[in-house]
């Protein structure tokens, strides 16, 4: 799509930017256009510019103005004087209806705390496509439900040959969603313009490959804007190495977000609960325990030296990214979910 007059996409050398995002700045005012195929979301603090843009678009092709955004790409938007609430209640209800679980007894966590699944144990499913479909829909649901990110990542490992225990675990996730169907993310109206990240790793947690899990969550002020659970690509020889690799992945995401927030000039803080990994990031010297690490892992160290990033230690019990790397008890899961901004919109 050719951008309307005055709207600039990211520069070609900034390959990490989002090319579906168009921004127009006029002094202290700005207008933002986000495009996904034929769905367009417009926001900003200049009403006249927004009106002019819609008129300009309408001269090029037929558009349907749906007014104030209440539903976008399956995400429901609700507002009050405190902020904006995002959830996917209707999407969850559709999943539960298709699975025949609308009257199921709810579970208190996405997965049992000590669940162990393998590729080989259990009877193969007669209809594995049903498992794949549900997991795919759950993956889309993680856009507003970071509390199921670990569960979805874990269950995604068995898509090629799912077995009965895997389907039972998926059913457990759906029963959890049944009990929290109205939950979503709240974005407060007033929030400090500062990026803060929490990075965590679960060392050698994959029983099949002994690879570690990376988990992170990133806040803009008090608003959660990015999160991920992902298995690391190589086997780490220590918990410090696993944590350091997680810090590198988190730093990459922070850098991408900083490109989107080009006016952001304050230091970025990355919280880690492993002091050894934090010391590796701060120490410019190689030694026996770190010389085997890939060069790209030292990306974090470079960004610290550049002044882009500062790291800080946080006790494990306060590590918000813990939710992204392992199944937790009900109390811990509820506490961390709340701190991530997961709540039920007040009616």
Each language-model region and where it sits:
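Reverse-transcriptase-like RNA-dependent polymerase core
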Residues: 1-14, 25-26, 103-118, 211-228
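A short glycine-rich, hydrophobically flanked beta-strand micro-motif that places a catalytic Asp/Glu
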Residues: 16-25, 182-192, 256-269
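Two-metal-ion RNase H-like nuclease active-site motif
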Residues: 137, 195-207
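C-terminal reverse transcriptase regions that engage the nucleic-acid substrate
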Residues: 36, 65-184, 315, 323-325
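Metal/cofactor- and membrane transport-associated sequence elements
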Residues: 1-62
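RNase H-like nuclease module associated with reverse transcription
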Residues: 71, 194, 212, 224, ...
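Alpha-helical coiled-coil heptad-repeat oligomerization segments
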Residues: 48-59, 123, 140, 154-158, ...
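Mobile genetic element proteins and their domesticated derivatives, centered on retroelements
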Residues: 1, 21, 38-40, 53, ...
